[in-house]
């Protein structure tokens, strides 16, 4: 079980995440997002962020050449495509970097139909909550829709995950659909302001999830 903290804008917080064992950090390259990194983290600053934490760039309908230039300049390990990117576009990008394609769900969406055309063109899926725009809503969708689906690719679970969800998540991991869960994605419910994380909340959540995983590994 891995944890991704998205919407990072402060290099010192990324380093702190790495030290506490967070697996992935998300950086939003979508100008309309309140967590857009813009000039907050330059390519030079990003390259100075060392450690084991993987750097994930979040993009929304960015043209291919601009996206690939950003991947190279920021030395990104993965890209998360959160817009209307086609399977052909995803496959083109996936020839050079790991691609996570995001799908925004309501409570009764036919997941198999949504992901079918992306099966061969992406490395992983992400399931997030449907909202008016492309950004996160800070709200959960009903995870039952995942339990009712056959998901044949590893995926991220996102959308309104917050402190206090640890038990619910641990129960989800035990479901058959939990076997394909690559990582959980947290963001706005762990902030003091957009792009600035409440590190104590994150630390407690990470510890609780890691402790539960360690207990399960010894059973």
Question: What are the functions of these language-model segments?
Answer:
Residues 1-219:
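Conserved N-terminal beta1-alpha1 strand-loop-helix module at the mouth
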